[in-house]
From Swiss-Prot:
Zinc finger region(s), CXXC-type: 671-717
InterPro entries noted in UniProt: F-box_dom, JHDM1_Histone_Demethylase, JmjC_dom, Leu-rich_rpt, Leu-rich_rpt_Cys-con_subtyp, LRR_dom_sf, Znf_CXXC, Znf_PHD-finger
Record-listed E.C. numbers: 1.14.11.27
Organism field: Drosophila melanogaster
Domain JmjC span(s) in chain numbering: 180-348
Protein name: JmjC domain-containing histone demethylation protein 1
Length: 1345
C-alpha cells in the first residue's frame, strides 16, 4: 500500500523492507517456511547490497535470495520489546479535535473498539476478499510483493483472490498498495471522523480538483489529488514487513477487519532517525533487526476489531501471524507539520524514489498556506476563489492558533524557500506565490502572541467544504452485483448511442456537402428527413405538405439493454451504408420516373419500397456518409406523395429491393454476440506466441492487460456461428429446432453442421430456403440467387443483397486472421451491356473511387461542373435494370486484366439457387456471377465531360493495354485506397499530385507520373464532346518510364515530356536549391513527393543536426540515420543506452557528438567497437559522470568485430572533449591524458573536485604538453596558482580560462601570459588568449557555438 503502515511504497520500506524480508526461511512461529523444506540451499556468499526499487524493477539488483540474520519468532517472544507506556489506549469518543489541539498527535493510539470513532466498515463476518474483488473489479492490477524473493509482481484482483483463498500456497505474497478511492468499495468504508476533520486532502486541497478525479487506480498520469486516503491490505500468514517510515511523514489509521497483526514501534527522536538513515543506507537490513539498535522499541499486538493510529515519523515493522484483511489510510494534518517536513528530508537523504513518496507533497504545502491565509486574513490567492471583504473579516472574532500550527506555517515557508527553483512546484491555481508568502508572514506576525488555552476550541481552523465526503452505504452483495450488471448495460448503451450520434453527424456533414453540389437535372433536395433524438423518431413535413411517420406509430421508445450473456439469441450487427440506400432507390425507380425526391434534410434517409404499379419516384439521393436508420415498407409512393406508415421493425422488405433496417441491437434490445471458435483449426489449437502486440499486453507476459485481445496467432481461421443462432424468418436454429441454451447444444455437432447462413453484407442470418422464399411473388424471384463464401463457414451473400447489388458496394466482412495490411477487399460496380459501348479497344482509364460511403456520389466537383450528372444517373439506372450482367471487379493486389467468367448455376449444382465463390490462387475469393453473363473486358472508359455517360466505374488501378502497352506500375493511389478501406475511412480519396507547371504547348490538362495514376484538371479533359473511345485512348497513351517522366493529355492528342525538361523533379537541381533552405523547411519538403523526399534527406544537406530537448522516438532515430550527419547534438534528451548504441553503430561518418545532460547509462553506450572515430565529444553536465565512468568510456571495448580487435579506446582520435559541470576528479584527468594523445581542447569548467594535482597530470604528459592548445578551468575552486607552473610546460597552450577561480590572482595570470612565446594577453580579468587578429578571430568563433 502506498499508504498504511504496511506500505511497500513507503520511503523506508522501499529501501529497507525489500532486503530484510527477502529470503527468510523462518516464519513467525520459528518454523521453516515452504521454501526451506528439506536441505537448505548452500550459498557461497550473503547478499548484503541494498536493493533497488524502481519502476523497472528488473533493471535493479538481483532478487534477494539470502537468509535473514535474525529470527522473527525470537523477536516475537523477546522481553526486550515488551515495553509499556509507548502506546496510549483510548475510547473512540475521547479522540476529538480538542484533544489534538491540547496534546498534539505524538504517540500511537490504540482503540480496542471502533465505537465513537465515526468509523464505519462492512460486516467482518460476511465481507471477504471476494467482495473486494467484486467492488474494485476482477481486472484491477495489484502490486504484489513476494516476501521471500522480494520480487515485484503484478496480478489481477481475480488472480490474487484465487491465491488468497487457496489452502495450499507455494509462496508468500503480500498486497499492501490497493488504494480504492473512487471505486465501488469507497462507499462501504468510512474513515474515522477525526481523520475527515483534519486531513489536508479534505480541508486544503481544492475541491474542484478532487471532484475531477476519474481514475480509480493510482496512476500518476490520471491523479488529480493525493490519492492515499483509503487502502486495503491483504496479507497471508507469516508475511513480514521490515522497519520503515510512512511516506511524507503521513500519519496512519489502521483497522483490523479480519485476522491479526504485530507491530514493533520506535519513536522518531533525532538519534533514532540518524540510526535509521545509516541502517537504510548500509544495505544490511537483512542482517540487523533495527529494533535491537535503538534504546526503546515496543511490541504491540492487534486483533480483529482493533483500530490503531500511528503518528508522524514513527518507525515501525509489521508481522502477520494469521491471514488478515485490513483497511487503513494515510493523512497529513496541521498538528505535526514540523515532523512531517523532517521526515520528507529523511526521504531525501535516503534517496527514496519519487514513486514511493507522497504525491503532490510540495503542491499540498502551497495549498495549506493559501487556505490559512484565506481563512484568517480573507485574502484569496487561488484562481476562482473570491476574497473576503475587510468588514466581514472585522466582524469575525480573533482565531487563536496552536503552537503546532504557528510553528508549522513558519517551517513550511522555510522549507519552500530552501527548495531549488525546479522543485518548488507552485500549483497553477496559485496566482502569485510571492504575495502569498508575504501574507503568510503577516499572518504569523499577527498570531505570534496567541494564547494556547484559547486555541483549544474543539473546532479545526481549516474546515472541509460541504459534500466533500461520499455518503456511506451498508454493504449488500446482491445489490452490488445488480449495480454491476446495470453499469455494464449502461456502458453498452452509451457506446451504441455514441456510435449512432457519430454516424448521424457524419450523415449530416455529407448531406450538407451533397446538397451544396446538387441542383442538376433529376436531383432535388426537398428538405424532407427524419430526426432521431433520445430514441424517438420524428417526422418533418415535405414541401408539398405530406409527411413521413417512422417508428410504427410515430414514436419509438428507447430500447432497454441487457448483458450479452443474458440472451440465447444470436443476431449479428447489421450495417447499412448510404450507397446501399441509393442502389435500392435506383432499383425501385428503374421502371418509371416520378417526381424527384431527395432525402437530404435529416439525420436518417428514408428509402422507398418498390411500387408495383410502376409509378415509382425518380432517383433518391442522400448524404454521402454513414446513416443511423433506413426504413422501408411496402407502401405505395406515387407522384411525389408519400403515404402509409413505415415499419421500423421490418428487417426485410419482401417486395422489391428496399433498404434494410440497420440496428445495432437485437430485437430484444440486447447487444450482438460474436462468432465462436471452431476449435479445430491450427490457430485454435496452438498456444500464445508471446511476441505479438496482444501477447505483450497480457498480464502473464508482463503487460498491463488493457487490450483484452487474444493472441494474433490464435485468431480462429474459421469462426463458427454460435449454436444459439436462429433464422430471422422461421426463428429456428441451424438444425431446424427451437433455440435452446448452449449447455443443451453440446452434442449439436453430432447432428451435422448448422444449416444457417450469415450474409457478409447485411449480416442477416437465415436458412437459404427461407431467404429465397421471402422473394416469392416478386418480379426478380426467378433470378434471385445467393453466393457462398467458401473462406468462412456458414457465410454467403444473400439473394436480397445480390439482387439489389449491395454485395458489390461493400467489402465483405473479414477477420483479422485473414487480413493483410497490403490486401484490399473487392470493389466492384455492376452495369448493363450499354456500359461497354464506346470502347475502342477494351482499354480503360479508371479514375480513383471516392469514399467508402460515396460509391455512387459524384467523384469530384469538376464532374458536376462538366455536366456529367445526367450521365451518372442514366448509366446507373440501366446498370441496375439489366441485373448486373457485367461485373467490373478489383481483387486484392491483382491486376484486372481479364474479367471473371460468368458461371451458371447449372455448372455448380443443377438447379441450385446458390452460386459459389471460388478461391483464387493467392487465397482471395473471386466471385462468380449469379446470372449467366457474357464475357466482357474488365474496365470501362473514363468519364468524359458531357460524354456518353455510360461508364461510372471506380477502381484503383490501371487496366492493361490491349495494344501491348504492358502492365502499369502499381501507384500510390492503390496503396492509399487499401489503407483507406482497411481503416473504414469515410474521407474522400484525393489523388496526390506534384505541384508542377506544364511546359509550353500543353493543353489545359496534364497527368503527373512517377508511378501515379493520371488525372485531368478542370474536368476530365478539354474536349467536352469527345467520345468514350477518345477518352479511353487518352488514358492509354505511352507514359514516360524515366524517374519523374510526365505524359500530358488533352482532347487533341498526347504530348510527351522527358524528365530533363522537368527541373522540379531533377535531384541534382533540387539539391542545389535545398542548400539554401533551413532544415525545418527541408522536413516539409520531404512530404511533397518521393523525389523531393530523397533529395531532401541527402547527407550533404544535414552535416549538422540539432535534436536537443527532443523526445528520442524510433522515428527520430531513423531520421537521423537516414541523414548521416557529421555533427550530432543530443543535449538534454532522455536518450536510452540501447538507443544511443543503435545510433552510433549506424553513423560511421559521425565526427562531433554532444550529449550534454544525458543519462550516464546512455553515455556508457560509447564503450563499443562500433563507436565511430569521434573528433569532438561533449559530456558536460552529465549526471553521474565520475572517474569510473571516464575509465569505462576510455578503455578498450570489450566487444570486437570479426577479425578485428581494438587494444586502444575507440575515442583515441578525440581532439575536443568537454566535461564541464561533471563529478570527475584528478584521477579522470590522468585517464584523459593517457588515452587521448591528439587532444587539443579540454573543458573542465565547474568541476569542483579538480585540484592542482589534476593540472599536474596535464603538465607531465608528453602528448598533452605538445598538442594541448586550449584549456578551460573556470569555476574550479580548488585550483591554485601552483597550477600555472605545470601549465607553463604546455608549449602549445594559447587559450586558458581561469575566471571564477578564487585561489588564482590576476597578477599571476598576467605573468603567465607574458612568459608565453605565443603573444598572449589577458582579457576579462583571467581569460588568457592570443592577441586578436582578423584571421584568429574567425578561427576562434566555433568554440562559442
Amino acid at each position: 500500500m502506498s499508504t498504511a503502515v504496511e506500505t511497500g511504497s513507503s520511503p523506508a520500506k522501499s529501501n529497507s523492507n525489500n532486503s530484510s524480508s527477502g529470503g527468510n526461511n523462518n516464519n513467525g512461529n520459528g518454523n521453516l517456511s515452504p521454501n526451506a523444506k528439506g536441505v537448505q540451499r548452500r550459498q557461497l556468499r550473503e547478499r548484503k547490497q541494498r536493493k533497488l526499487y524502481l519502476e523497472e524493477w528488473s533493471l535493479g539488483d538481483e532478487d534477494g535470495e539470502g537468509t535473514r540474520g535474525f529470527s522473527v519468532a525470537e523477536k516475537l517472544e523477546s522481553s526486550k520489546f515488551a515495553q509499556a507506556g509507548m502506546v496510549r489506549e483510548m475510547r473512540g469518543c475521547d479522540l476529538t479535535v480538542a484533544f489534538l489541539q491540547q496534546h498534539g498527535f505524538n504517540i500511537p493510539l490504540l482503540f480496542r473498539d471502533k465505537a465513537g470513532l465515526g468509523l464505519r466498515m462492512p460486516d467482518p463476518q460476511e465481507f471477504t476478499v471476494n467482495d473486494v474483488r467484486l467492488c474494485v473489479g476482477s481486472r484491477r492490477l495489484l502490486d504484489v510483493m513476494d516476501v521471500n524473493t522480494q520480487k515485484n509482481l503484478q496480478m489481477t484482483m481475480k488472480e490474487w483472490q484465487q491465491y488468497y483463498d487457496s489452502p495450499q500456497k507455494d509462496r508468500l505474497l503480500n498486497v499492501i498498495s490497493l488504494e480504492f478511492s473512487h471505486t465501488r468499495l469507497d462507499r462501504f468504508v468510512q474513515s474515522p471522523e477525526i481523520v475527515r476533520q483534519i486531513d489536508w486532502v479534505d480541508v486544503v486541497w481544492p475541491k474542484q480538483l478532487k471532484d475531477a478525479q476519474r481514475e480509480g487506480t493510482n496512476l500518476l498520469g490520471g491523479m488529480m489529488y493525493p490519492k492515499v486516503q483509503k487502502y486495503c491490505l491483504m496479507s497471508v500468514k507469516n508475511c513480514y514487513t521490515d522497519f520503515h517510515i510512512d511516506f511524507g511523514g503521513t500519519s496512519v489509521w489502521y483497522h483490523i477487519l479480519r485476522g491479526s497483526k504485530v507491530f514493533w514501534l520506535i519513536p522518531p527522536t533525532d538519534r533514532n532517525l540518524q540510526l535509521y538513515e545509516k541502517w537504510v543506507l548500509s544495505g544490511k537490513q537483512a542482517d540487523i533487526f533495527f529494533g535491537d539498535t535503538v534504546e526503546k522499541c515496543a511490541r504491540v499486538y492487534l486483533t480483529a476489531g482493533n483500530t490503531f493510529f500511528i503518528p508522524t515519523g514513527w518507525i515501525h515493522a509489521v508481522y502477520t501471524p494469521t491471514q488478515s484483511l485490513v483497511f487503513g489510510g494515510n493523512f497529513l494534518h496541521s498538528f505535526g507539520i514540523v515532523k512531517q517536513l523532517k521526515t520528507a528530508s529523511v526521504e531525501d537523504s535516503t534517496k527514496v524514489p519519487q514513486k514511493f513518496r507522497y504525491p503532490f507533497f510540495t503542491e499540498m504545502l502551497w495549498y495549506v498556506l493559501a487556505r490559512y491565509v484565506h481563512t484568517l486574513l480573507g485574502h484569496s490567492h487561488l484562481e476562482g476563489e473570491a476574497s473576503l471583504s475587510e468588514d466581514e473579516m472585522a466582524a469575525r472574532p480573533h482565531t487563536h492558533l496552536t503552537h503546532h500550527e504557528l510553528f508549522g506555517l513558519k517551517e513550511i515557508v522555510m522549507y519552500l524557500y530552501d527548495l531549488p527553483p525546479q522543485k518548488k512546484n507552485v500549483p497553477s491555481l496559485v496566482l502569485d506565490p510571492v504575495a502569498l508568502i508575504k501574507d503568510v508572514r503577516s499572518l504569523v506576525e499577527r498570531h505570534c502572541k496567541d494564547q494556547q488555552d484559547l486555541a483549544i476550541t474543539g473546532v479545526s481552523v481549516l474546515k472541509s467544504p460541504p459534500g466533500s465526503q461520499p455518503p456511506f452505504l451498508l454493504y449488500d452483495r446482491t445489490r452490488v452485483k445488480q449495480e454491476i450488471k446495470q453499469e455494464i448495460a449502461r456502458k453498452n448503451a452509451e457506446v451504441i448511442r455514441e456510435q449512432q450520434q457519430l454516424e448521424a453527424g457524419r450523415a449530416r456533414e455529407a448531406e450538407s456537402d451533397t446538397s451544396q453540389s446538387t441542383g442538376v437535372g433529376s436531383v432535388i433536395g426537398m428538405g424532407a428527413g427524419v430526426e432521431y433524438s433520445n430514441g424517438v423518431m420524428k417526422k418533418e413535413q415535405l414541401e408539398n405538405g405530406s409527411g413521413v411517420t417512422v417508428g410504427g406509430h410515430g414514436s419509438q421508445p428507447e430500447a432497454t439493454f441487457a448483458l450479452p450473456t443474458d440472451t440465447l439469441k444470436y443476431r449479428p450487427p447489421k450495417k447499412m451504408h448510404l450507397a446501399t440506400a441509393l442502389v435500392a432507390a435506383a432499383a425501385s425507380s428503374s421502371s418509371g420516373g416520378g417526381g424527384p425526391v431527395a432525402g437530404v434534410g435529416g439525420s436518417a434517409v428514408v428509402g422507398s419500397s418498390h411500387s408495383p404499379t410502376g409509378g415509382g419516384v425518380g432517383p433518391v439521393t442522400g448524404a454521402g456518409g454513414a446513416i443511423s436508420v433506413i426504413a422501408t415498407s411496402s407502401s405505395y409512393i406515387e407522384g411525389g406523395q408519400v403515404g402509409g406508415i413505415l415499419n421500423m421493425d421490418n428487417c426485410h422488405s419482401p417486395e422489391g429491393g428496399g433498404a434494410k433496417l440497420s440496428p445495432n441491437l437485437t430485437g430484444t434490445g440486447q447487444p450482438r454476440r460474436r462468432r465462436t471458435r471452431c476449435k479445430n483449426c491450427a490457430a485454435c489449437q496452438r498456444s500464445d506466441c508471446g511476441t505479438c502486440p496482444f501477447c505483450m499486453d497480457m498480464v502473464k507476459f508482463g503487460g498491463p492487460g488493457r487490450a483484452k485481445q487474444t493472441c494474433m496467432m490464435r485468431q480462429c481461421l474459421s469462426p463458427m456461428l454460435p449454436v444459439t443462432a436462429q433464422c430471422v424468418y422461421c426463428h429456428l436454429d441451424g438444425w431446424r429446432q427451437t433455440p435452446v441454451s448452449p449447455q443443451t447444444k453440446q452434442l449439436a455437432s453430432a447432428d451435422g453442421p448448422s444449416a444457417l447462413m450469415e450474409c457478409s453484407v447485411c449480416y442477416e442470418i437465415a436458412h437459404p430456403d427461407c431467404a429465397l422464399s421471402q422473394l416469392d411473388g416478386t418480379e426478380d424471384a426467378a433470378d434471385a440467387k445467393g453466393i457462398v463464401n467458401e473462406d468462412l463457414p456458414n457465410s454467403w451473400e444473400c439473394p436480397s443483397c445480390c439482387r439489389s447489388g449491395k454485395n458489390y458496394d461493400y467489402k465483405p466482412r473479414h477477420f483479422r486472421a485473414r487480413q493483410k495490411s497490403s490486401e484490399v477487399r473487392r470493389v466492384s460496380v455492376s452495369h448493363g451491356q450499354g456500359g461497354a459501348e464506346g470502347h475502342a479497344d477494351g482499354n480503360t482509364l479508371l479514375p480513383p473511387p471516392v469514399g467508402q460511403y460515396n460509391d455512387f456520389v459524384f467523384t469530384s466537383e469538376s464532374e458536376m461542373e462538366s455536366g456529367t450528372v445526367s450521365g451518372h444517373m442514366t448509366h446507373w439506372k440501366h446498370g441496375m435494370k439489366r441485373h448486373h450482367q457485367l461485373e467490373v471487379k478489383t481483387e486484392r493486389n491483382n491486376s484486372c486484366d481479364t474479367p471473371s467468367p460468368g458461371i451458371s448455376p447449372n455448372a455448380i449444382g443443377g438447379d441450385s439457387k446458390v452460386g459459389k465463390r471460388r478461391k483464387s490462387d493467392d487465397g482471395t475469393s473471386v466471385s462468380s456471377s449469379m446470372h449467366e453473363s457474357n464475357d466482357a473486358p474488365c474496365g470501362s472508359s473514363a468519364e468524359g465531360a458531357g460524354g456518353a455517360g455510360n461508364a461510372n466505374v471506380s477502381t484503383n488501378q490501371w487496366s492493361g493495354s490491349g495494344g501491348g502497352g504492358g502492365s502499369r506500375k502499381k501507384n500510390s493511389i492503390r496503396s492509399q485506397l487499401a489503407q483507406q478501406m482497411l481503416n473504414s475511412s469515410t474521407r474522400v480519396l484525393k489523388k496526390p499530385q506534384y505541384v508542377v507547371r506544364p511546359a509550353s504547348g500543353t493543353g489545359s490538362s496534364s497527368s503527373s507520373g512517377n508511378g501515379g495514376s493520371a488525372s485531368a484538371t478542370n474536368g476530365i479533359s478539354n474536349g467536352s464532346n469527345q467520345s468514350g473511345a477518345n477518352s479511353c485512348g487518352a488514358g492509354n497513351g505511352e507514359r514516360g518510364t524515366n524517374n519523374g517522366g510526365l505524359s500530358g493529355s488533352n482532347g487533341l492528342g498526347n504530348q510527351h515530356y522527358s524528365s530533363s525538361q522537368n527541373l522540379a523533379l531533377d535531384p541534382t537541381v533540387l539539391k542545389i536549391i535545398f542548400r539554401y533552405l533551413p532544415q525545418d523547411t527541408l522536413v516539409t519538403c520531404c512530404s511533397v513527393c518521393k523525389v523531393w523526399s530523397n533529395a531532401a534527406v541527402d547527407p550533404d544537406l544535414w552535416k549538422k543536426m540539432n535534436c536537443s530537448e527532443h523526445k528520442m522516438s524510433a522515428s527520430l532515430l531513423t531520421a537521423i540515420v537516414r541523414r548521416q550527419p557529421e555533427h550530432l547534438i543530443l543535449d538534454w534528451t532522455q536518450i536510452a543506452k540501447r538507443q544511443l548504441a543503435w545510433l552510433v553503430a549506424r553513423l560511421p561518418a559521425l565526427k562531433n557528438l554532444s550529449l550534454q545532460n544525458c543519462p550516464i547509462q546512455a553515455v556508457l553506450a560509447l564503450h563499443t567497437c562500433l563507436c565511430p572515430p569521434l573528433q569532438t565529444l561533449d559530456l558536460s553536465f552529465v549526471r553521474g559522470l565520475n572517474d569510473a565512468a571516464i575509465r569505462d568510456i576510455l578503455s578498450p571495448p570489450k566487444d570486437s568485430r570479426p577479425g578485428l580487435s581494438d587494444s586502444k579506446t575507440r575515442l583515441r582520435d578525440l581532439k575536443v572533449m568537454k566535461l564541464a559541470g561533471t563529478d570527475i576528479s584528478d584521477v579522470a584527468v590522468r585517464y584523459i591524458t593517457q588515452s587521448l594523445p591528439y587532444l587539443r581542447h579540454l573543458d573542465l569548467s565547474s568541476c569542483q573536485r579538480i585540484t592542482d594535482a589534476g593540472v599536474a597530470q596535464i603538465g607531465t604528459s608528453t602528448t598533452a604538453t605538445a598538442r594541448l592548445t586550449e584549456l578551460n578551468l573556470s569555476a574550479c575552486r580548488l585550483v591554485s596558482e601552483n597550477a600555472l607552473e605545470h601549465l607553463a610546460k604546455c608549449e602549445g597552450l594559447i587559450w586558458l580560462d581561469l575566471r571564477h577561480v578564487p585561489q588564482v590572482s590576476t597578477q599571476s595570470v598576467i605573468r603567465f601570459a607574458s612568459n608565453s612565446k605565443h603573444d598572449l594577453c589577458v582579457r576579462d580579468i583571467k581569460l588568457v588568449e592570443r592577441r586578436r587578429r582578423n584571421s584568429t578571430t574567425a578561427n576562434r568563433s566555433w568554440h562559442h557555438d
